[in-house]
Swiss-Prot record:
The gene is lpxD. GO terms for biological process: lipid A biosynthetic process. The keyword Lipid metabolism applies. This is UDP-3-O-(3-hydroxymyristoyl)glucosamine N-acyltransferase. PANTHER family: UDP-3-O-ACYLGLUCOSAMINE N-ACYLTRANSFERASE, UDP-3-O-ACYLGLUCOSAMINE N-ACYLTRANSFERASE 1, MITOCHONDRIAL-RELATED. Pathway: Glycolipid biosynthesis; lipid IV(A) biosynthesis; lipid IV(A) from (3R)-3-hydroxytetradecanoyl-[acyl-carrier-protein] and UDP-N-acetyl-alpha-D-glucosamine: step 3/6.
Length: 340
């Protein structure tokens, strides 16, 4: 990790220095593990008491928490956002070699921009267009006529099928598959007849996709991922799904076909969302949500039964299973009381 003076770091982060600005910062760590040469952050005043035992050389915090800090500090309005920017400055992610590995297989009909990097055993088929500064990791497959915008990076073993469009400055983690066939079949007297998926996948700019996520191509129209969308690991995005700009999708989410999700939504982990319906802008669905109907109003939508001790859960489950009968009995009692 690169070293940097605290004062220089503060200048890049637009932060106020309190304490020794000449302190050399060698890394970022959590509150409980930070050493005197490292910097940490306090994003929630509820954990203010941790400052008393923190050994970090400096802490990123708000003005309100400064009196409780025994070390040097960088004072900012939003410590967590500052931490994100600080991590970018001190990032240790290996940078790719600016070359094309000898083992890469590249079609003569592919078009490569300037400073493109292609790892060993990657396959680039005919008609592919790679913008400037694109990075294709080792073992990737890029299918025919796919376009990848400038500055985008695919880690090792990403598979992108034919005629997919990926925008600029996207980041796609290993094992992800984009543009595989959607789950389309017609039934002929008990036999499943495959429907070729004739659409594609269009991904906007600044999209990040986690490891081992699958985004299927559309049946006729395209599956669309908007600008600024972030998708976690092991998600399944079915054919013809549309995800609006700047929506966040946590790990393990399953979206059924032809679902339309609005902008600025947040989908909690392991949620399952029905297809052929719409979720409006600015909806937050909590983890393990089961969404069976359209959502037309912005807001927070929890689902499911939170964890309980087994004995309590069994009683809760029994009540839920018998809710219809309980409701009928209650209405009968109400009618009896009304008559009296």
């Amino acid at each position: 990790m690169p070293s940097i003076r605290l004062a220089d770091l503060a200048q890049q982060l637009d932060a106020q220095v309190h304490g020794d600005g000449d302190l050399v910062i060698t890394g970022i760590a959590s509150m409980h593990s930070a050493e005197p040469s490292q910097i940490t952050f306090l994003s929630n005043s509820r954990y203010q008491e941790q400052l008393a035992t923190c050994n970090a050389g400096a802490v990123v915090l708000t003005e309100a928490d400064l009196p409780f800090c025994k070390s040097a500090a960088l004072v900012v309005k939003n410590p967590y956002l500052t931490y994100a920017r600080m991590a970018q400055i001190m990032d240790t992610t290996p940078q790719p070699a600016q070359n094309i590995a000898p083992g890469a297989v590249i079609s003569p009909q592919a078009t490569l921009g300037e400073n493109v990097s292609i790892g060993a055993n990657a396959v680039i088929e005919s008609g592919v267009v790679l913008g400037d500064n694109v990075v294709i990791g080792a073992g990737c497959f890029i299918g025919k006529n796919t376009h990848i915008g400038a500055g985008s990076r695919l880690w090792a073993n990403v598979s992108v099928y034919h005629e997919v469009v990926i925008g600029q400055n996207c980041l796609i983690q290993s094992g992800t598959v984009i543009g595989a066939d959607g789950f389309g079949y017609a039934n002929d007297r008990g036999n499943w007849i495959k429907i070729p998926q004739l659409g594609s996948v269009h991904i906007g700019d600044r999209v990040e996709i986690g490891a081992c996520t699958t985004i299927d191509r559309g049946a006729l129209d395209n599956t669309i991922i908007g600008n600024g969308v972030i998708i976690d690991n092991q998600c399944q995005i079915a054919h013809n799904v549309v995800i609006g700009d700047n929506t966040a999708v946590a790990g393990g989410v399953i979206m059924a076909g032809s679902l339309k999700v609005g902008r600025y939504c947040m989908i909690g982990g392991a949620s399952v969302i029905n297809g052929h319906m719409e979720i409006c802008d600015k909806v937050t669905i909590t983890g393990m949500g089961m969404v069976m109907r359209p959502i037309t109003e912005p807001g927070l939508y929890p689902s499911g039964i939170p964890l309980q001790p087994n004995k309590v859960w069994r009683k809760t489950a029994a009540l839920v299973m018998n809710i219809d009968g309980i409701n009928k009995r209650l209405k009968a009692i109400e009618r009896k009381i009304d008559k009296e």
